């Protein structure tokens, strides 16, 4: 008789029964802290202060600006686009910010699942491959504009998280 899996399960049972779910308030606090950390990282990059997030730069319209109403799914979609843009820049300045965005998206998914509205994994820009020429021609401008707009979007997300956004 093969009882290996059953014996392993019974051996792990005391540990599994003691595991507590992470309180949603803790997830929300971690989300806010990570947003503040990303904003601080953007502030530490000195050249991001040279362009306003509202300023229009020709050819960079694919970088999202502020959204009127941000649901959790819209926040995730926006972060996916920024993450895709930052990954394409190949700049040492944005590697950690891009990693932080991935972690932030995971926290948003936890918040959404706590509200019984699991989010599908958002994709970035579908036409992104055609923008390669724009990115290569203006890496510095793209980085500055993307980081400024990301910072504004994150600060807006931080305010909206207090209002308990919908799915």
From Swiss-Prot:
The keyword Signal applies. Belongs to the leptin family. Disulfide bonds join 117-167. The gene is LEP. It is found in: Secreted. GO terms for cellular component: extracellular space. InterPro entries: 4_helix_cytokine-like_core, Leptin. Keywords: Disulfide bond, Obesity, Secreted, Signal. Coiled coil: none annotated. One of its GO terms (biological process) is regulation of brown fat cell differentiation. Key player in the regulation of energy balance and body weight control. Once released into the circulation, has central and peripheral effects by binding LEPR, found in many tissues, which results in the activation of several major signaling pathways. In the hypothalamus, acts as an appetite-regulating factor that induces a decrease in food intake and an increase in energy consumption by inducing anorexinogenic factors and suppressing orexigenic neuropeptides, also regulates bone mass and secretion of hypothalamo-pituitary-adrenal hormones. The lineage of its organism: Eukaryota, Metazoa, Chordata, Craniata, Vertebrata. The keyword Secreted applies. Gene3D superfamilies: 1.20.1250.10. One of its GO terms (molecular function) is peptide hormone receptor binding. Residues 1-21 form the signal peptide. Its main location: secreted. This is Leptin. It comes from the Eukaryota.
